[in-house]
Amino acid sequence: MSHFALVAPPYPSHFAAMQALGGELVERGHQVSFFHQPEAERWLSDSRLGFVAIGHAECPPGSLDLAMRRVADPAGPLRPRRLIKQLAHTTGMLISNLPQALRDHRVDAVI
């Protein structure tokens, strides 16, 4: 069967939705792996799904918690700017690291 890579914004709700999809793919006989910054692995609870940590240099320990605190802060007009900046950083990390990781892990399709 195929090896599917799951890539989502670094938010628990997005990971939960993708994890449900990944579980269904595993039930159908596929291999499924999340690809993201190391700290995002904590949001996975389905042991059937793999996790490939990428972006170690761009996302050092503590960076995900800091990003979550900044995005969750409802105060002021800068919240949308912080969200966009955080997503741009994540996108840059994925663009830099994901292609090689997908090749290394012989991924057939990306969701």
PLM regions and their residue ranges:
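Glycosyltransferase specificity loop/lid
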Residues: 1-111
